[in-house]
């Protein structure tokens, strides 16, 4: 058997792509047309985004083409070849009816897959030496073009001034070992049970097909689709092209009991699996009984209601749904008795808020100073507050850290946030005449360090935000200068404040109907707002300390009855799926929770 496998590898050099130079494609469309379209994109690309029709992401199907021999109408790849003469020959065969056509010169990059290497002996046309571009080729990847007039190739290149050498220099096509999972063979194809593809087969592909054929076929198709679309997302992020939003699903969950807006309510990872549920309180119509209610996320943005009764829900200031013991499950914590005990109802797998734990006596501090902050080096949250002895943070195991400061800052400016990126929440607020930002930084040694900015604009009241503008640090941001500019500050690695400004994509006057959230999976918060007139969500992506001017629009399937970010209307992410999707979930009335799921490509 080892001998046979060795022979296969000799006959098919499956782990090495032979070409690392530039690539070529013959096309009838002019450079201006290609530029206006944003690049060389496949036929299925436009219908995928504009009409919602499926795009074929099977490299095997792309290489085979349609039964007529033409390109598939739903094709998700763009063909290229490795030398200009081959491109000229292809052009003469398929574009002979055009007096003039073009051969585009394309820079190597990981969106290009070596068809022969990936498909091996199953490559239908190995003589073509084709490299296929997954999802197409952005205009910024095109180095230039040659003109073919009446069949004669002019070898003088016309340079593309929009070519991004800073992005595409020194890149290479995707390695076969990175691409076998994208081969796109049918679920029952023998390749999935052979070397090398068996080692890269997505779940359900080629394994025990005869035993559970239908399930495996569906699993194989779904897993291949998720892998390819995640790859497409990553490529578009790497190439810094304008991204697109695609609606992928609409769900409607009925008989949902929504939390009462008079109490705390939060979207939380109730099960520790990345799917957010909506939890809060409700009170019987006669006011006789209070309960915790959660719209529990069952997966795929479908929900059902759960109810939990407790003997004591504690005082309003200090109530939170957080992970108190670091086990990944959400607990319910509060201050009980005469503001003297920290109490948490801990969750067990499938048993929410079922195990009560008392941290013992403590000074609960001043009402408006109470907050929960993430403890550095753990997944726990601690209860933090200002007391007569200074600031104290205490966890459910009664471990405390403390610091003193002579200025607790303005009430409408206080945030607990990881402004220095070390994994623990710091206490930040505006001091003096809203002119300086002061933070007490949580250190890994349990000690606290105070830092203060130089003069800055504290911004408009109620328009101050905690935003992850960069991938590893929370930024303290304020709306300033006629509501069109945002200034943000963070603590740099040398321990000093860095303040910068950026233009907003729209004027921002209040917090209603906006939300900062990462919708494209790059660990940076984007900005979204609800527009009531056309009933749409509009988002602008974070481009690292700036927001794109390219507006992404989602048309909602129903009308939300509350404003975005107010509680029952929220954009949420799912983190347990390769497709990296988000959804705008909202109370549509009559006990219905609607979720319009979308993906950013």
From Swiss-Prot:
Pfam families, per the entry: Enterotoxin_a
Segment forming the signal sequence: 1-18
Amino-acid positions noted as binding NAD(+) in the UniProt annotation, renumbered to this chain: 26-43, 130
Keyword terms: Disulfide bond, Enterotoxin, Glycosyltransferase, NAD, NADP, Nucleotide-binding, Nucleotidyltransferase, Secreted, Signal, Toxin, Transferase, Virulence
Keyword NAD: yes
A molecular function GO annotation: NAD+-protein-arginine ADP-ribosyltransferase activity
Catalytic site positions: 130
SUPFAM superfamilies documented for this protein: ADP-ribosylation, Integrin alpha N-terminal domain
Location(s) in or outside the cell: Secreted
Gene Ontology CC terms: extracellular space
Role description: A probable mono(ADP-ribosyl)transferase, it may ADP-ribosylate Arg in target protein(s). Upon expression in yeast cells causes cell death.
Annotated family: Belongs to the enterotoxin A family.
Name of the featured protein: NAD(+)--arginine ADP-ribosyltransferase Chelt
Organism: Vibrio cholerae
